Amino acid sequence: MKNTALTNIHESLGAKMVPFAGYNMPVQYEGVNAEHEIVRTGVGVFDVSHMGEFFLKGENALALIQKVTSNDASKLVDGKAQYSCLPNNEGGIVDDLIIYKIADNHYMLVVNASNIEKDWNWISSHNDLGVDMQNLSDSYSLLAIQGPKAAEAMQSLTSIDLVNMPYYSFQIGEFAGLKDVTVSATGYTGSGGFEIYFKNEDAEAIWNKIFEAGKPFGIKPIGLAARDTLRLEMGFCLYGNDINDTTSPLEAGLGWITKFDKEFTNSANLKKQKEEGVARKLVAFEMQERAVPRHDYEIVDASGNVIGIVTSGTMSPSMNIGIGLGYVPTSFSTVDSDIFIRIRKNDVLAKVVKLPFYKK
């Protein structure tokens, strides 16, 4: 089991620690609902240092990225980031990731913790272009400072203009007195904020300065359980639940990051799938009575026939209703369609809705 550079701090704060993707991670501090509310209304900090960071350099770096990812990275300018995925050869997804363009011929790829080795091997196997690849996942820490008060709370720590930083842009500069910190206007919560990347040896110093600066704003540490409820209220996919090596980006509602004006892994088959239409789709649904849908619960039709499976589900802390995502036949995927979730032998009515669940 790996620790992050901040494990001792989490333990000293009384965090409940659990194994996640091979790491000892804080799942909650004072409680999921309270932590969720802090991020929706104020500012909270997640240690997500388990995520992976790959650096690609060289004149063919973009060509390699274009070959293995579904989105069009040629559209990136320096200081911009892009959400994308790594399609496999079978019509599924190796991983979803964020691509950062640091400069021409210099990129950072941020991948899911559970897929670091798999992604590294996958991209390496396609690197016949002489691209210099470095896996620095074990050297970098990552904090997500999220919430509507994040910019204001952190502004005293940097000369980077946080308030006016466009979504999915980033700058590398001084933060909390440390140089070469990557400050990115990204996140997995839907409440705004930043993700900051820095060397492990700076982790405790940065953590302490963040909490000092954020104290007047009621800043709190947040665990992975609230990270999950926050992302689910936005309908953001979680790899391993909502997307995996058998789900196509088109089935998962990720057509917007699948660009067919270039060739990439399995693009011909995915293009054909787009033209012919998909047989199943990932839908968002809200329970119509008080009930909590959970991962792997069956989705059934009005006659009780199993038509799909819940991939993610929870009781929404912001809305106080059961919400979830799951794959159903395309005929059940239109908004307002009635579906039923099988919860301990009871089939409970749910309605297909448009994302996000949580409207600010």
Swiss-Prot record:
Matches recorded under InterPro entries: GCS_T, GCS_T_bac, GCST_C, GCV_T_N, GcvT/YgfZ/DmdA, GcvT/YgfZ_C, TrmE/GcvT_dom1
Gene3D superfamilies given in the database record: Aminomethyltransferase beta-barrel domains (3.30.70.1400), Aminomethyltransferase fragment (4.10.1250.10), Probable tRNA modification gtpase trme, domain 1 (3.30.1360.120)
Pfam families for this protein: GCV_T (PF01571), GCV_T_C (PF08669)
Enzyme class: transferase
GO CC terms: cytosol; glycine cleavage complex
Any one GO molecular-function label of the UniProt entry: transaminase activity
Transmembrane segments: none
Described purpose of this protein according to its UniProt entry: The glycine cleavage system catalyzes the degradation of glycine.
HAMAP family in the cross-refs: GcvT
Name under which the protein is recorded: Aminomethyltransferase
Record organism: Flavobacterium psychrophilum (strain ATCC 49511 / DSM 21280 / CIP 103535 / JIP02/86)
Gene that produces this protein: gcvT
